[in-house]
Amino acid sequence: MSDGIKLYVMPTGTMHADLTWLLLRPDMVMADRHNTARPANWAAVPTHCVYIDHPDGKIIWDAGVPRDWEERWGPTGLQEYFPVDEVTEDMWLDSRLKQLGHEPNDIDYLLLSHLHFDHAGQAELWKDATHTKVLCSKDEYDGAFSYEGYSLGAHVKKDYESLTLETVEGDTEVLPGVTLLQTPGHTWGTMSLKVDLPDSGTMIFTSDAIYLAESYGPPAIGAGIVYDSVKWFASVEKIRGIAEETNATVVFGHSGAQLAELKKIPDYYS
């Protein structure tokens, strides 16, 4: 743990989507024989990034959705299933940086949980950065560059191909009290972020290792977008074990209900 850390949660716009993508819970998303015409559960899917002002460096966790989402996602069809239809000018990550008084190159570390379209969407802000270290997991890097063409599933190469990416393997402490956790399953190399704060205690930002409180359980409930279900369930239990050991606050990847209750920029956790 390190004294003097400030952690800011930054909403970066809300998509809407069929909840089935995020939660395979029959009573919430599926028809049954008594209700065969049940409509889709069209749900809010908020996104967020995190800024950590640490005595030893400035950190951004994830890069949100891109401003040009409709055009960028056009070749993939993702814009039809995940429209970014609830966002204001101040929410885009480049706007958030200005609110913090920073340019992209002022940031010491950009930590990318994984390289999906809604987590690396504005990572291009760092394509010309000479100071910032941009980190993802080795498994995510290998997978994200393993295919030919514009996209594969929710990976869109335009988001990350211009970046100078450095990779990590295993759980890695980036700065004192700030640790990347390997939590694969959602993608090849999804990571979560553990931050040990002097006053607020430990916080674990799960990204898409755990979408929602309902995903976490127990028991854990899977989702429509999962690359490896066995690894995904193992990652949920890894997070649960760490959370129980450290009495951590677990912050889910896309929970609107939880996000509404969290402190948000300009307020912070310390």
Predicted features, each with a name:
Residues Y81-S95, D199-S270:
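Cap/insert and terminal regions of metallo-dependent hydrolase folds
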Residues T12-G13, A63-P66, L115, D139-E140, ...:
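Active-site metal-binding loops of divalent metal-dependent hydrolases
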Residues H16, R67-W69, D142, Y211-A213, ...:
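Feature marks short, surface-exposed loop/turn motifs that line or immediately flank catalytic pockets
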Residues M1-D118, K133-Q182, G201-S207, Y227-N247, ...:
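Metallo-beta-lactamase
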Residues K6-V9, C49-D53, I59, G170-P198:
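Core dinuclear metal-dependent hydrolase active-site scaffold
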Residues W126-T130:
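Short, conserved loop/helix-junction motifs that constitute active-site signature segments
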